[in-house]
From Swiss-Prot:
GO terms for molecular function: glycine hydroxymethyltransferase activity; pyridoxal phosphate binding. Keywords: Amino-acid biosynthesis, Cytoplasm, One-carbon metabolism, Pyridoxal phosphate, Transferase. This is Serine hydroxymethyltransferase. Pfam families: SHMT (PF00464). PROSITE patterns: SHMT. The record marks 228 as: Plays an important role in substrate specificity. GO terms for cellular component: cytosol.
Length: 419
């Protein structure tokens, strides 16, 4: 029999300890991984609700199971809020992840063997944009475009490549590109070769929702995003589109029944909360601060002699190129981690190292901004990071790490994630 008094701590202390340890790690570490963020207690509450128990195959008003009247309310709330947030006529809130949202778009619009043209993973793209190890590079003929030595998209080169390979779809979006993408230019190129323009805005969706980064919605045939990252919601996916009822039918069918069975209604409830939060005025203030903080950190790294790819940032992330300092991304990641600063190693343009080693680190500001860091705080943080990087392979390295960790713990105590 079930009782509301049941809890994990009494039943499974090993698991409970891991949960508590992760809570402490998040509170005592500074999170700079660009794809990570802190969900609100409201979002987490929704994910733990009784909708965990409910199967709801189909869509609102057209389910294959009974007892879905409240699931319909939840899903319709999420759909309506997503459409309002991004200025879309169509939203599918059922994809379990960004990758599954992307897979549904490919399935809806392409046939196996069709050519797609997406940003290379090594140049800042995503696995699902045509990487050889991904379904997107196995099922479809994937061509890749890259960035210049200055870290920018060369639209003339992209146009030339598109005319040469004649893709059925051009994929816009990125996981490690710090500048503004010209969505209108990409649509222009797609139209020239008769291709769909599909944009994966997962990394910048929160910035776009807040109006601090250009929206692809007026230009793309289809847009996808995750609902975590800059949106700060639950881990999940979302598909958006405008002005084409036939396309909407194809997308719905590609999600269910082609790609997924029952939706995760408890996660859709959390998405509804997330979208409501993102429609609030304070969300715009938060996203503007995310960009200000990223720019402030970039300036410190540049002043300290570190090369920032593309020489700056216009969004929530930037890449630090460590080649000239003789450091690897893997070693830098490990050293910073010991001082409770979490980043991720990342390839840089023309990277001489293997993908698991790399010559750079990716730094993002959504999470630190969420816990209250301002420009002064992140500038100080960037200085601490440079201190650690400067000390690598030197006698004072251990002392610098120890000193920095003390400072990190102090600022984390001053600015907790969940006060």
């Amino acid at each position: 029999m079930l009782k509301r008094s049941m809890n994990i701590a009494d039943y499974d202390p090993v698991l409970w300890q891991a949960i508590q340890d992760e809570n402490l790690r998040q509170e005592e570490h500074i999170e700079l991984i660009a794809s990570e963020n802190y969900a609100s207690p409201r979002v987490m509450e929704a994910q733990g609700c009784q909708f965990t128990n409910k199967y709801a195959e189909g869509y609102p008003g057209k389910r294959y199971y009974g007892g879905c009247e409240y699931a319909d309310i939840v899903e319709q709330l999420a759909i309506d809020r997503a459409k309002a947030l991004f200025g879309a006529d169509y939203a599918n809130v059922q994809p379990h992840s960004g990758s599954q949202a992307n897979a549904a778009v490919y399935m809806a619009l392409l046939n196996p063997g069709d050519t797609i043209l997406g940003m290379s993973l090594a140049h800042g793209g995503h696995l699902t944009h045509g990487a050889s190890v991904s379904f997107s590079g196995k099922i479809y003929k994937a061509e890749q475009y890259g960035i210049t030595s200055e870290g920018l998209i060369d639209y003339d080169a992209l146009r030339k490549q598109a005319h040469e390979v004649k893709p059925k779809m051009i994929v816009g979006g990125f996981s490690a590109y710090s500048q503004i993408v010209d969505w209108a230019k990409m649509r222009e190129i797609a139209d020239e070769v008769g291709a769909y323009l599909f944009v994966d805005m997962a990394h910048v969706a929160g910035l776009i929702a807040a109006g601090v980064y250009p929206s692809p919605m007026p230009h793309a045939h289809v847009v996808t995003t995750t609902t975590h990252k800059t949106l700060a919601g639950p881990r999940g996916g979302l598909i958006l589109a405008n002005g084409n009822e036939e396309l909407y039918k194809k997308l719905n069918s590609a999600v269910f029944p082609a790609g997924q069975g029952g939706p995760l209604v408890h996660v859709i409830a959390a998405k509804a909360v997330c979208f409501k939060e993102a429609l609030e005025p304070e969300f715009k203030t938060y996203q503007a601060q995310v960009v200000k903080n990223a720019k402030a950190m970039v300036e410190v790294f540049k002043q300290r002699g570190y090369n920032v790819v593309s020489n700056g940032t216009e969004n929530h992330l930037f890449l630090v190129d460590l080649v000239s300092h003789g450091l690897t991304g893997k070693a830098a990641d490990a050293a910073l981690s010991r001082a409770n600063i979490t980043v991720n190693k990342n390839a840089v343009p023309n990277d001489p190292q293997k993908p698991f080693v790399t010559s750079g680190i990716r730094v993002g500001t959504p999470a630190v901004t969420r816990r209250g860091f301002n420009e002064e705080d992140v500038a100080e943080l960037a200085g601490w990071m440079c201190d650690i990087l400067d000390s690598m392979n030197k006698d004072n390295h251990e002392q610098v790490i120890a000193d920095t960790k003390e400072k990190v713990l102090a600022i984390c105590k001053r600015l907790p994630v969940y006060p």
